[in-house]
């Protein structure tokens, strides 16, 4: 089962039409939609805004459902010049650009892990990339242009940049 989280209700609402055999459950002040997307069991949840809310929602879902992977989906800003609205970004590593636990740890270093960037799950990323490839091919066969898939680092933070 995959947990699909999003920080905005509109983002989860966009996924709901693809959910089959949906069942709503409630817990920790959140609504969890259980079902399947293309026969893959999933749980959809609006985590609310911020990393603490996302962590709390994920922790509750992980304690309640047989979650094997967590995917956070939704819109985001970008620093990459060739990224267009609708393009997909798949992480190979993740970091928090404004994490600062000095003087005990270097800027952006996750305390006690000795890492500034956390590696994404290569297995899940491969599955997502393969699914994108199948979808992009179907879009092209239907005469529609598919958004571009970009691979690379994804940063998060508490400061708005721009």
Residue ranges and their predicted role:
Residues 1-59, 65:
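N-terminal short beta-loop-beta anion/metal-coordinating cradle
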Residues 79-162:
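Mid-sequence, gly/pro-rich, charge-dense loop/helix-turn segments that line enzyme active sites
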Residues 66-71:
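Proline-aspartate-enriched helix->loop->beta-strand connector
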Residues 59-60, 77-80:
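A generic local secondary-structure boundary/capping motif
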